[in-house]
UniProtKB/Swiss-Prot annotation:
CDD domains linked: ASKHA_NBD_HSP70_DnaK-like (cd10234)
Positions of the UniProt region annotated as Disordered: 586-626
Record's note on what induces expression: By stress conditions e.g. heat shock.
Record's compositionally biased regions (Low complexity): 586-606
Protein function: Acts as a chaperone.
NCBIfam families: PRK00290.1, prok_dnaK
Protein known as: Chaperone protein DnaK
Organism the protein comes from: Bifidobacterium longum (strain NCC 2705)
GO MF terms held by the record: ATP binding; ATP-dependent protein folding chaperone; unfolded protein binding
Disulfide bond annotation, renumbered to this chain: none
Lineage: superkingdom: Bacteria
Gene: dnaK
Biased composition (Acidic residues): 607-626
Length: 626
């Protein structure tokens, strides 16, 4: 049976885990690391690179390297590579395919089922895009679950039997969430994890802290050299890598040096060098506004849950950005001096929780119940542009809610159902999720027809909406996919393309291996001929040398089949060398044996006159004779 996995599809890094004997295990990737950079690159030859190898070549291939694509999920953003427009779903699918391949190599069996995490504050379009990315990657997405919920799931399983409230503070590379959860265990060890409230900011994360350093460095260079690096893509990529490294170093040191040579050239040809020292105090000062943006979601969660800071039992930090000392201090301040729990790895805990949830869904774990919530209110636009909410935020999911509406005009033949997600009073200020029309309403004065609108949110947090005219029984429904949603045929096309790319990559790898083997064989055969020229006939030397040259010529081209043919012909010719060398070796051995046998026979059959009589003398006799 195929294995199920849990995947944390992150902005900066991604992680994959599975259950081994009922316990979660993080899967090491092909490079030997426990997390994989969420970076995808397209080489000039058309090869798709993912992870560390893509990240390493970013400076020399800026326009064809994509990072932090998670920030574009649920939008209509695309990137043009060689005339093909790639969507965020397709780029994310490449990351998922890499994780899937590495997991299959690690486990030695197929991986088809996955629970994929997303930020708790992702809206419907972003969740649908995440699910689509999984489909394109060839995964059966069992569930989309919220990252803080997954983290609490991993953390909560280690706790005792007492009921506890856990606050999860999740600051990743590109998104920020705060969730409050209640965890309880009964006497049989059955855990119930219920989300009480969640809030966040989908455009706040470690990337923004990096950008502050980049902006500062650009400003320093401009002041010193008069050169604006903000238009230089290669210089910016180098600054980005330096900024990320500086941020990490300032988590453990009070200052760091940023030194970069030959970043650019001034108009008069002077090279631009960078040598700056950034202190932690200066870094915290320049990023104080970002830190301030973390306060509102925290306060909103406490307000929505109706609790005070003193009701929080534990604080769990998730996401690499929570390693920054200023973030830890902020959490401590907000929670009234509570020290955050250090028992979980902030980079891995989300994937671990997702793996546990995959086990729950597949029936491998029967000791956990997870109850999540919808992060944003859902409603429709009614007369006057009002946002009429049918499902309030922080409602436990799955859930279903219906409400009856009517027409605004006499004899109105149809109604346009416009679905929105958000907390603002007017529909236009919220996120539009989709629109559909219910037609065929029987003529009647306004206010008479009864139109029942039903919202159904599944366990993935994805919305299904239907509208029914109670008078005629006519019904219209849709699954919300948002403005960026992909129709099924488009997803199917992308799945086929992704499979084709995977097949292409596999063939490219096989071709490279074939060429390497052929090159090595040509070299070793040529050496064998040169080392044994004196033992080989001119005909064999010429035949093999010609075949070696033919193989070398084939290797200069791109036709792998031609290389294979040339290698096969060389192997056939090279066999003659072996036959000659072994034959000569056998002949020499036979000759040596014949010489030895002749000597023995001569001694035995000679005449008596030729026989030498001898006696053995001891040492004393020998001495006397001397």
């Amino acid at each position: 049976m195929a294995r199920a996995v849990g995947i944390d599809l992150g902005t900066t890094n991604s992680c994959i885990a599975t259950l081994e004997g009922g316990e979660p295990t993080v899967i090491v990737n092909a490079e030997g690391a426990r997390t994989t950079p969420s970076v995808v690159a397209f080489s000039k030859s058309g090869e798709i690179l993912v992870g560390e190898v893509a990240k390493r070549q970013a400076v020399t291939n800026v326009d064809r390297t994509i990072s932090s694509v998670k920030r574009h999920m649920g939008s209509d953003w695309t990137v043009d590579i060689d005339g093909k427009k790639w969507t965020p779903q397709e780029i994310s699918a490449q990351i998922l395919m890499k994780l899937k391949r590495d997991a299959e190599a690690y486990l030695g069996e197929p991986v088809t089922d996955a629970v994929i995490t997303c930020p708790a504050y992702f809206n419907d379009a972003q969740r649908q895009a995440t699910k689509d990315a999984g489909k394109i990657a060839g995964l059966n997405v069992l569930r989309i679950i919220n990252e803080p919920t997954a983290a609490a799931l991993a953390y909560g399983l280690e706790k005792g039997k007492e009921d506890e409230r856990i606050l999860v503070f999740d600051l990743g590379g590109g998104t920020f969430d705060v969730s409050l959860l209640e965890i309880g265990k009964d006497d049989d060890g059955f855990s119930t994890i219920q989300v009480q409230a969640t809030n966040g900011d989908n455009h706040l994360g470690g990337d923004d802290w990096d950008q502050k350093i980049i902006d500062w460095l650009v400003s320093e260079v401009k002041n010193k050299y008069g050169v604006d690096l903000s238009k230089d893509k290669i210089a910016l990529q180098r600054l980005k890598e330096a900024a990320e490294q500086a941020k990490k170093e300032l988590s453990s040191s009070t200052s760091t040096s940023i030194s970069m040579q030959y970043l650019a050239m001034t108009p008069d040809g002077t090279p631009v060098h960078l040598d700056e020292t950034l202190t932690r105090a200066h870094f915290e000062e320049m990023t104080s506004d970002l830190l301030g943006r973390c306060r509102t979601p925290f306060n909103n969660v406490l307000h929505d849950a109706g609790i005070s800071v003193s009701d929080i039992d534990h604080v769990v930090l998730v996401g690499g950005s929570t390693r920054m000392p200023a973030v830890k201090e902020l959490v401590k301040e907000l929670t009234g001096g509570k020290e955050a729990n250090q028992s979980v790895n902030p980079d891995e805990v989300v994937a671990v929780g997702a793996a546990v949830q995959s086990g729950v869904i597949k029936g491998d774990r029967k000791d956990v119940l997870l109850i999540d919530v919808t992060p944003l209110s859902l409603g429709i636009e009614t007369k006057g542009g009002i946002m009429t909410k049918l499902i309030d935020r922080n409602t436990a999911i799955p859930t279903k809610r219906s409400e009856v509406f009517s027409t605004a005009e006499d004899n109105q033949p149809s109604v346009l159902i416009q679905v929105y997600q958000g907390e603002r009073e007017f529909a236009r200020d919220n996120k539009p999720l989709g629109t559909f029309e219910l037609t065929g309403i029987a003529p009647a004065p306004r206010g008479v027809p009864q139109i029942e609108v039903t919202f159904d949110i599944d366990a993935n947090g994805i919305v299904h909406v239907s509208a029914k005219d109670k008078g005629t029984g006519k019904e219209q429904s849709m699954t919300i996919t948002g403005g960026s949603g992909l129709p099924k045929d488009e997803i199917d096309r992308m799945v086929k393309e992704a499979e084709a790319h995977e097949a292409e990559d596999k063939k490219r790898k096989e071709d490279a291996e074939t060429r390497n083997q052929a090159e090595a064989f040509a070299y070793s055969t040529e050496k064998l001929v040169n080392d044994n020229k004196d033992k080989l006939s001119d005909d064999i030397v010429k035949e093999v040398t010609d075949k070696v040259n033919a193989l070398k010529e084939a290797l200069k081209g791109d036709d792998t089949e031609k290389v294979k043919t040339a290698q096969t012909e060389l192997m056939t010719a090279a066999q003659k060398i072996g036959q000659v060398l072994y034959a000569q070796q056998g002949a020499e051995g036979a000759a040596a044996g014949a010489d030895g046998a002749g000597a023995s026979a001569g001694s035995a059959s000679g005449s008596d006159d030729d026989t030498v009589e001898a006696e053995v003398v001891d040492d004393d006799d020998d001495k006397d004779n001397k």
